[in-house]
Regions:
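Short coil/turn segments at beta-strand junctions that form active-site/ligand-binding loops
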Residues: 1, 44-47, 72-73, 106, ...
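N-terminal active-site segment of His-dependent metallophosphoesterases
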Residues: 1-62, 147-149, 175-183
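Active-site neighborhood of phospho(di)ester-bond hydrolases with catalytic His/Asp-centered motifs
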Residues: 6-7, 48-53, 74-80, 110-111, ...
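Catalytic metal-binding/acid-base residues of hydrolase active sites
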Residues: 10, 54-55, 81-83, 114-115, ...
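A short, conserved beta-to-alpha structural element at the edge of catalytic cores
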Residues: 26-41, 72-90, 150-175
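Short, conserved, surface-exposed binding loops centered on an aromatic residue
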Residues: 40, 65-69, 100
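Metal-dependent catalytic neighborhoods of phosphoester/phosphodiester hydrolases
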Residues: 52-69, 78, 83-92, 120-122, ...
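Conserved beta-sheet core of the metallophosphoesterase superfamily
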Residues: 90-180
Length: 183
């Protein structure tokens, strides 16, 4: 089982092509390409954390069918464009506004929005987010996992680390000694 992250798919969103300069001839072409890339990247046994803004402009039945057709066990970290009926779709394994995961020797905090500081930041944990569509300069150990930054497909922690050159932090913070006894 592999662990993947994505955000800001905006399936069905007519304005996404122009707002985010997506290179597709139509919304239908955009949706088809993202579905195909998701399903060639993710297997049925994999796990995917979607960090918000799943779909806009699709009815609830279409959203449910779309979610069901995407490979993997899917979790939603809600975004500003996820209405209550998206949060209630049966295809989500879990739904929450914030999550923390540990995998491949790394910890990560997950939210639709980027943080300036986050839990365990000093211990090397990552902040994975969406919302900014690749337009926000990241802090160290921070990454926008939105499809606009990752060829319209989910990504792994290894791919994120390779692009960002993030090194695993030591498991223990060094002890700092100063004259006068602090530390």
């Amino acid at each position: 089982m592999a662990l993947f992250f994505t955000s800001d798919t905006h399936f069905g969103h007519a304005g996404a092509r122009s707002l985010y300069r997506r290179p597709f001839a139509s919304v239908a072409a955009m949706d088809a390409a993202m579905r195909a890339r998701w399903n060639t990247t993710v297997s049925a046994a994999d796990e995917v954390w979607h960090l918000g803004d799943f779909a806009l402009g699709l009815g609830v039945v279409a959203r449910a069918a779309l979610l069901e057709g995407l490979h993997g066990r899917k979790h939603l970290v809600s975004g500003n464009n996820d209405p209550p009926d998206t949060l209630a779709l049966a295809g989500w394994s879990s739904v929450q506004p914030y999550a923390e995961v540990e995998a491949d020797g790394r910890g990560a905090v997950l939210c639709h929005y980027a943080f300036r500081t986050w839990r365990n930041m000093g211990r090397g944990w990552l902040n994975l987010h969406g919302h900014s569509h690749g337009r926000l300069k990241p802090l160290p150990r921070q990454a926008d996992v939105g499809v606009d930054s990752w060829d319209f497909r989910p990504v792994t922690l290894q791919q994120i680390a390779a692009r960002r050159r993030i090194r695993a932090a030591p498991s223990r913070l060094p002890r700092i000694s100063t004259p006068g006894g602090i530390g």
